[in-house]
Amino acid sequence: MLQLLVLKIEDPGCFWVIIKGCSPFLDHDVDYQKLNSAMNDFYNSTCQDIEIKPLTLEEGQVCVVYCEELKCWCRAIVKSITSSADQYLAECFLVDFAKNIPVKSKNIRVVVESFMQLPYRAKKFSLYCTKPVTLHIDFCRDSTDIVPAKKWDNAAIQYFQNLLKATTQVEARLCAVEEDTFEVYLYVTIKDEKVCVNDDLVAKNYACYMSPTKNKNLDYLEKPRLNIKSAPSFNKLNPALTLWPMFLQGKDVQGMEDSHGVNFPAQSLQHTWCKGIVGDLRPTATAQDKAVKCNMDSLRDSPKDKSEKKHHCISLKDTNKRVESSVYWPAKRGITIYADPDVPEASALSQKSNEKPLRLTEKKEYDEKNSCVKLLQFLNPDPLRADGISDLQQLQKLKGLQPPVVVLRNKIKPCLTIDSSPLSADLKKALQRNKFPGPSHTESYSWPPIARGCDVVVISHCESNPLLYLLPVLTVLQTGACYKSLPSRNGPLAVIVCPGWKKAQFIFELLGEYSMSSRPLHPVLLTIGLHKEEAKNTKLPRGCDVIVTTPYSLLRLLACQSLLFLRLCHLILDEVEVLFLEANEQMFAILDNFKKNIEVEERESAPHQIVAVGVHWNKHIEHLIKEFMNDPYIVITAMEEAALYGNVQQVVHLCLECEKTSSLLQALDFIPSQAQKTLIFTCSVAETEIVCKVVESSSIFCLKMHKEMIFNLQNVLEQWKKKLSSGSQIILALTDDCVPLLAITDATCVIHFSFPASPKVFGGRLYCMSDHFHAEQGSPAEQGDKKAKSVLLLTEKDASHAVGVLRYLERADAKVPAELYEFTAGVLEAKEDKKAGRPLCPYLKAFGFCKDKRICPDRHRINPETDLPRKLSSQALPSFGYIKIIPFYILNATNYFGRIVDKHMDLYATLNAEMNEYFKDSNKTTVEKVEKFGLYGLAEKTLFHRVQVLEVNQKEDAWALDDILVEFIDEGRTGLVTRDQLLHLPEHFHTLPPQAVEFIVCRVKPADNEIEWNPKVTRYIHHKIVGKLHDAKVILALGNTVWIDPMVHITNLSSLKTSVIDYNVRAEILSMGMGIDNPEHIEQLKKLREDAKIPACEESLSQTPPRVTGTSPAQDQDHPSEEQGGQGTPPAEDAACLQSPQPEDTGAEGGAESKTSSENQKPGGYLVFKRWLSSNR
């Protein structure tokens, strides 16, 4: 949606606006401000001596005029010219302000080409397909009728103006561009209600919808195009293949399904100012190849009529019928396997009477081709090879793309289109406005049971999209009647639990966007810290029906205000496997509370639903299903995860590449107790032949199938499908490209002789055993030898996949051989060796640990070559001692960039004074050519900085102002500047190395297993410390990073000869309840340094702590001494505790549960700086 600012209204067919926000149609506001400034400077100063006046004036001429009202020079177009006594008077239209003004010829100038680089800011808009109407009286028939008119009447214009005046927000959805006019659907927000202006004018009989005529030169962005010549089903399909028996059995051709697809010819917009429009307006995801997402008249009809259209699908036999194909899979122990029917997900055509000639032409061409096809079929019933492609490719083309499969516990009829989805009408309209392409494969199976209020578990690779559950849950919440039996009190109906604050923030924003298309839900984002008072004082707004939170925050609120959740009906678990992994106890406590509440008799008629969505299956989800769900629907579209759900036995054999064949024979069961069907997967034809020979050498019958044996497909299938007696077995060696053709689902064992190329290929192999997936974990006696088995041969060639294999086996609760652990450890060591050039892991630096080294791309070892403390001048960074620092750039609550201040020899202060002296003497020479990584000067108010160029966004014209990303090398922050702000920096200012240093406050980490600081903690610390001088003790220095503990702000009371500690940064973080103690931080870093054998650096800028005596006369009123648990400590005790040995490590790991050391208190106690810093931790 485009955000608009209306400048001028002529009528609904012509109004002028400015496009706001980040849109591909405009440059930033700052660009126009700089353009206006440059124009005024140029025409006011440069042109005083030489006035650039046009030699002639013509209508339509572009020029620059002086506007008396705006007091500035503006770009304009001459509309008309009139002559007066002494000079000409021109009526000009200001293209950036949408104003018509009279201008004297003396105030008109020739426009310089560089001032025409930016597009006109005022853009002409029109309501799309919305035309004026008038009352037509037929005297002959004595009747009246409302018919289209040529111009808008005054009442319509007045109503349109009143609408736009009363609105608080104007938005538009671009539909077409005609010459210089944008045709849009216009939306206005009035009293928190969004109204489509096009619909409103039509509903009130001020206008009507009219299809664009054929002679209009429109570039449609949404209009579907039907091009018979390009339809692959008619021209690109080999006619001899069309009526081949396999095709008639329901295996449609992919090209047939795409023959009437829609396209979006947005590339027809060639305006220079429209760069990026295609990427901005196309749907957020591509539709599946077989789906047709739009109607032919989707833009021509009123949105109210769209849902009433009848959809028609075109097939080879009848234009009003469709070919459906479905695959039946036998159900085993409550599991049903489905394949999507090969039908379009939406209608293919819906045409009006004015398109009948097109349809007749299409039908005629179709009938002609159909006759030829029947003749060819009669003459040659066997399929012909087309275009010289292989037999395997030909068959794959005939069968089409294999429909994605899904494993279900209960049968679900998928919703293949938005229209057939169980979503509310308002949500459907919102999705259509947002160009939603239609439900994905997973969404088509997930939406129906969730919208019915059932318990649902969804395991899919697309879990990161919250619309998977958000839209159907919003639909359920619209049905207010089912909640009437609930207590009439304040409290949420639905709670969405996310693994961290960042995901919760994302879902909350998405919820806010789509809840506008439903009744008011008043959603709330809850992140509650460790303070009990915070949970007790939390108040929900009246009418709050949805809460988005984390497990720890929710449990704290439950502990203090459990009555708030008496109305809770829907519990949604986002990234369920992560929730159970990182907050297992908290999750089961939440589930127990939910189960206890819904078992109350008064709530029997109210809905109770648990929706769990994740990427991976694990044992905790199985426990969730058994203990807390009622006959849930289970939807799994990731086949490798379905194998875990189906309890497929996972076995890994480690061997050398040269020993694979012997390991294969060891994996085979030569004397099975039950009938055994085994598949051996290979990666090539040669490998298939070798495997077949090896197996047959052991006197076991072995079939084979690869692309060169496609002629034998039917024979192989017949052999495979034969019923086996007990104790007998059949083995088939095949390549992965044969899997879709064979469609095997009854294998009992799969051996991966070659490593699968991707998880999808791995899942496809395991799906061949789907008939033997077990829905419930039975006893070994019940399962016996019926349990499906997967055997993976892992060699040294597959070393890069060892970590992923180990993770999969751990989730499967499989027996992991000790050799695999050793092998994986060696692989990880080798990976770490390759990371020598990578930066040190930011989490390792900030907290002393990395959450998952196995997948982290950064380095986790200290490199003696690159991690030696950097030199700021003649001395290196201090590795110990006391320093004074000024933080300038705050990355997060504990990570800052700033400068070390040396009171004995501050080289930067000297440099800064010299720079100020140099630049104030008119030495501000701007840079003509900017080089990447070049060093320049930059003026900010009265200060001058050294900056290094990181990126240059260079524009074509010299007058254009470049966007340049620079780093302030003495402060650590980055910023965007323009070329004219950069100053030439003499070489003698380059000699001092960059003074910006990274500081990390030690021994504190985010609470609740988070790895990133909550933004409100970062904001608080930023406001507290930025730009202020602090005292700190250095613990460690590596590269350009200094670890400090503590970091305090001190006020010197010279009159009392006393120093007062205002605050300790670490204590401030702990006092907010969002952080906990991290005593292992320093020890882990020092251990890494010892392992790297980096010698202690003797060169140091360390300072001795100041000699101070006395205490603070009064406690800081802004920071009362109050422990996080609510208990206060007298100043004397505070000082005593801080001076005792190891005063800050004696607390519990929570660090904020009122049992930690006194340093975890609110700051404000009376501390002597020397003793406090010298205390032995």
Swiss-Prot record:
Superkingdom assignment: Eukaryota
Tudor domain mapped to chain residues: 56-118, 900-999
Keyword Repeat appears in the UniProt entry: yes
UniProtKB keywords: ATP-binding, Developmental protein, Differentiation, Helicase, Hydrolase, Meiosis, Nucleotide-binding, Repeat, RNA-mediated gene silencing, Spermatogenesis
Keyword tRNA processing: no
GO biological process: fertilization; germ-line stem cell division; male meiotic nuclear division; piRNA processing; spermatogenesis; transposable element silencing by piRNA-mediated DNA methylation
Helicase ATP-binding domain sequence ranges: 447-635
One Pfam family recorded for the sequence: TUDOR
Disulfide bonds: none
Gene Ontology CC annotations of this record: PET complex
Annotated binding of ATP, by residue: S460, H461, C462, E463, S464, N465, P466, L467
MF (Gene Ontology): ATP binding; ATP hydrolysis activity; nucleic acid binding; RNA helicase activity
Location of the motif DEAH box: 574-577
Signal peptide: none
Group of enzyme by EC: hydrolase
SUPFAM superfamilies, per database record: P-loop containing nucleoside triphosphate hydrolases, Tudor/PWWP/MBT
Entry EC no(s): 3.6.4.13
Catalytic activity: ATP + H2O = ADP + phosphate + H(+)
Biased composition (Polar residues): 1100-1115
Gene3D superfamilies reported for this sequence: 2.30.30.140, 2.40.50.90, P-loop containing nucleotide triphosphate hydrolases
Region (Disordered): 1098-1177
Oligomer status and interactors: Component of a mRNP complex containing PIWIL2, TDRD1 and piRNAs. Component of the PET complex, at least composed of EXD1, PIWIL2, TDRD12 and piRNAs.
Summary of the function given for this chain in its UniProt record: Probable ATP-binding RNA helicase required during spermatogenesis to repress transposable elements and preventing their mobilization, which is essential for the germline integrity. Acts via the piRNA metabolic process, which mediates the repression of transposable elements during meiosis by forming complexes composed of piRNAs and Piwi proteins and governs the methylation and subsequent repression of transposons. Involved in the secondary piRNAs metabolic process.
Name by which UniProt lists this protein: Putative ATP-dependent RNA helicase TDRD12
The gene coding this protein: TDRD12
